[in-house]
């Protein structure tokens, strides 16, 4: 929901992320509640779940005001990637100047299972979403990528049921890793597969 600044797929907003990066208040829950308030029935709405992650646009483009007080206190509010991080993604086959989309199967195969362990996995318990960091040239963690995993998919499925939504849709099946996300979604929604 944040897309260019923070998480690509947050279910809820998170107080862990400061306002310095000009992020907005959007989350899946915010959008669903606004549609419901506008009169859309829950039975008319599906929740979209991406079987991919995104490097935030903020990571590859300058533009954050680093003079603000909370700018240096959080991995998400760092300067954009330097040559080291751009080269790291390029070595894995990603030209971040063209696209910041990373399929879930590549997140698992190339990032989470990186033999050099250059990525660290995190979980934001307020936003209900996983994210990865990489090290800066100074050794500080830099927010690198947000994505869905089986845990976040199960939580979103519970949300769908609790809100009485029509169901879920996802993009894209071919990006899944050995059907982990599709299987989790089906199981959590009570769909036999």
Q: Where are the regions a protein language model picked out?
A:
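Substrate-binding surface in catalytic domains of secreted glycosidases
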Residues: 1-98
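Generic alpha-helical secondary structure signal
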Residues: 16, 39, 84, 98, ...
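Short, flexible coil/linker elements and helix-boundary hinge sites characteristic
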Residues: 73-75, 93, 99-100, 114, ...
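Membrane-proximal ectodomain caps of single-pass cell-surface receptors
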Residues: 92, 103-110
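Extracellular low-complexity, Gly/Ser/Thr-rich intrinsically disordered linkers
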Residues: 111-193
